[in-house]
Amino acid sequence: MHTENARDTLKQMSKVTGKACVCFNLRKASRLLTQVYDQALKPTGIKVTQFSLMMAVAGNSGTTMGKLARPLGMDRTTLSRNAKILENKGLIEIGEGDDRREQILNLTEKGVLVLEEVIPIWEGVQKKLAEKMGDQRLKELMSDLRDLVRESKH
């Protein structure tokens, strides 16, 4: 009888958490948006996660893996695994830093060319989202997300 009551309680709680849990809803939105971007980028052979990493490398040329991981909200192991995929595609190069343990990231010429192809597609997806949500709502969402990230670090 106790298990039956627990199941009913959990069923009700699952409805509440689905509506109220920040993490659940952000992850759901992230998965769905990832699908939208990945579908648009499919002809380029690049996924949106790879695009994000390549743009971070482009904006921080010659930086170390450790320094790049922090602003991306990634641990170094995950970043290293994702960077290796891009290196295997010839899109970035991973070099040795002053300290042999340091790994330096740079875009390759092929990586630059791929980004030149991907950016207009990414901009198109951004534009469609802005049209659906409205510019103001999208700006507010982005501001709220930055606030959430900042507050989560404390």
Show which residues each predicted segment covers:
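Short capping segments at the starts of secondary-structure elements
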Residues: N60-T64
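N-terminal leader segment of winged-helix/HTH proteins
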Residues: M1-T44
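Pre-recognition alpha-helix immediately N-terminal to the DNA-recognition helix
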Residues: L32, V36, S52-M55, L113
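Short, locally clustered residues in the helix-turn-helix/winged-helix DNA-binding domain
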Residues: R27, M55-G59, I119
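Residues within helix-turn-helix
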Residues: M65-G66, T77, K84, Q103
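Key DNA-contact positions within bacterial/archaeal DNA-binding proteins
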Residues: T49-F51, T77
